[in-house]
């Protein structure tokens, strides 16, 4: 068992990583006998894990209710969020309840935002079941729903009280979803940890095959990096913005193509290559390193080109709604070397468009 702490003073919390955590009620601390919990999951995961998690909580004396939501990025919306609020109010649940988010990034983001909003804030526990949510979205307190005009535009910073990562969940994860998560894994190596990038170049196939030692190290290292970044910059006023490598381009793909048609990690993968080409055109990232990034993404089962039906000009309106835009100026996360990156403003739109065009299949 691995345990990592996200250090935020009185709001610090543990990330627990191991196989078989769903069978141990201690995994869901600080929930205890006599307390209420609302278990939030989706229609795909409910048959796999709902009875198991609910059972271990009820056997420990927790009073559990549940809400099962539709599955997919297109359902990370205010309309579906209202279903969670309605379920909480119907029982009813008070300010001492705990929301348990059992699912991937959509469930974690949506249930977390429900926790941040319901009665001005209740506890919640992240129980991520996809690789992407285990290595990224469950850690750090970003919660949100989407708007038709932009991804994650309605949300809050709100930290969980714990993150429970059961490695056994990945055994049921479709290969495409696993690859989607690997985009965020590779991102950490590009932006902050050259040694981890080199390790991935040697071990990416072992991770895709779910070899236990490689998988455990991969998830642990990602959580260590994310925890350190969040502890240093919880509200993304500085270095935390580096975690958005590829996301400004990728969110444009998701919004333009329709949420769910491109998985988040797929869009981020293409976006990271676009960012790499932008950095190359600026003279701060070598063509050789662009190819190394592309090669690793391909080996991870990810796209390195944007959608053919999306012209470069279609990206900019979405990119200008990005949360890093300041005073109308587009700001991009760009690599400066493998393991190093920066937030850069003032990049000419023509250069951005040319870099996107570099990535059209």
Swiss-Prot record:
CDD domains assigned: DHQS
Catalysed reaction, written as an equation: 7-phospho-2-dehydro-3-deoxy-D-arabino-heptonate = 3-dehydroquinate + phosphate
Residues where Zn(2+) binds: 184, 247, 264
Subcellular location: Cytoplasm
Pfam families: DHQ_synthase (PF01761), DHQS_C (PF24621)
Keywords: Amino-acid biosynthesis, Aromatic amino acid biosynthesis, Cobalt, Cytoplasm, Lyase, Metal-binding, NAD, Nucleotide-binding, Zinc
UniProt keyword annotation of GTP-binding present: no
Positions with a binding annotation for NAD(+): 71-76, 105-109, 129-130, 142, 151
Cofactor note: Binds 1 divalent metal cation per subunit. Can use either Co(2+) or Zn(2+).
EC number: 4.2.3.4
One MF annotation (Gene Ontology) recorded for this entry: metal ion binding
Gene Ontology CC annotations of this record: cytoplasm
Name this polypeptide is given: 3-dehydroquinate synthase
Source organism phylogeny: Bacteria, Pseudomonadati, Pseudomonadota, Gammaproteobacteria, Enterobacterales
This protein's encoding gene: aroB
